[in-house]
Amino acid sequence: MCEERKKLLEIKHLKKYFPIPRKITEVLSKKPQKSVKAVDDITLDIYEDEILALVGESGCGKSSFARTIIRLYDPDSGQIIMDGKDITKMSKKELRPLKRNSQMVFQDPYSSLNARMMVGDMLKEEFLYHHICEPSEVDGKIKDILEKVGLSDDAIDRFPSEFSGGQRQRIGIARALA
């Protein structure tokens, strides 16, 4: 007998369009607003223990799709169902507990890290914002996560500029795990 897999994420007909700015003459002549179809009617399911890789040409909508799924962008239409809950119309407050389970690891790690913050402070911010553990446990949790991604404790007191590109990618993964 086949065991039923748990569906973690269900995307139904998701669309996200970005308006193209119009020239003043187009506004005055009442020409219709044109838009870039960054995400155009995507439907897919992701099940427990699956990994999804978005692959495509530069500018084809991969990042826009991911940002729309985790609601950094509001979708124009469609549904995003996470763990059986339709998050498409949820407020930021309602989304907060769900965002704990959905994090992005950006392909350019340097641009996603705050150059003025030490790695330990960035990770601490994640733990405190999401109320993951008691404040007294945070330092130990940070060391554990850094170890999981292959970085030593000395990373805690260093800035992103002091790391290689691969190490910065691991810092991004550590933030997602936190």
PLM-predicted stretches and their roles:
Residues 55-56:
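The feature captures the beta-strand-to-loop junction immediately N-terminal to the Walker
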Residues 70:
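Helix-to-loop junction immediately C-terminal to a conserved catalytic motif
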Residues 173:
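Hydrophobic anchor residue at the start of the ABC signature
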